[in-house]
């Protein structure tokens, strides 16, 4: 595959994954913090605080998972490299 096409595909996938994460975060935090039947157009202070905390936790967890997955990926690559060196 052409390196430019691969880079473009990777960028498109990253945008798609970020959009998916944003949509899931929005839905989860809205369900948790905003009652299904509300009377006012503006968020209450409690709802706004809940949403702030929910988003912060969601993003923190997303960052932690990303770091852990990267760490596991590096470990897997090392194991594969050692296995390939041992059989070669």
Swiss-Prot record:
Disulfide bridge partners, by residue number: 29-54, 33-50
Write out the coiled-coil annotation as residue ranges. Answer: none
Per the record, the major location class is mitochondrion
Known Pfam families for this protein? zf-Tim10_DDP
Q: Keyword Nucleus, does the record have it? A: no
Superkingdom of source: Eukaryota
Q: Recall the GO molecular function terms of this protein's record.
A: metal ion binding
Q: Which GO terms describe its cellular component?
A: mitochondrial inner membrane
Topological relation to the membrane, as annotated: Peripheral membrane protein
Sorted alphabetically, the Gene Ontology BP terms of this entry are: protein insertion into mitochondrial inner membrane
Motif Twin CX3C motif: where? 29-54
**Entry-linked InterPro entries:** Tim10-like, Tim10-like_dom_sf
The listed locations are: Mitochondrion inner membrane
Q: Which controlled-vocabulary keywords does the entry list?
A: Chaperone, Disulfide bond, Membrane, Metal-binding, Mitochondrion, Mitochondrion inner membrane, Protein transport, Translocation, Transport, Zinc
Q: Which family, according to UniProt? A: Belongs to the small Tim family.
On assembly, the entry states: Heterohexamer; composed of 3 copies of TIMM9 and 3 copies of TIMM10/TIM10A, named soluble 70 kDa complex. The complex forms a 6-bladed alpha-propeller structure and associates with the TIMM22 component of the TIM22 complex. Interacts with multi-pass transmembrane proteins in transit.
Describe the task this protein carries out: Mitochondrial intermembrane chaperone that participates in the import and insertion of multi-pass transmembrane proteins into the mitochondrial inner membrane. May also be required for the transfer of beta-barrel precursors from the TOM complex to the sorting and assembly machinery (SAM complex) of the outer membrane. Acts as a chaperone-like protein that protects the hydrophobic precursors from aggregation and guide them through the mitochondrial intermembrane space.
Notes on the domains: The twin CX3C motif contains 4 conserved Cys residues that form 2 disulfide bonds in the mitochondrial intermembrane space. However, during the transit of TIMM10 from cytoplasm into mitochondrion, the Cys residues probably coordinate zinc, thereby preventing folding and allowing its transfer across mitochondrial outer membrane.
User: Can you say what this protein is called?
Assistant: Mitochondrial import inner membrane translocase subunit Tim10
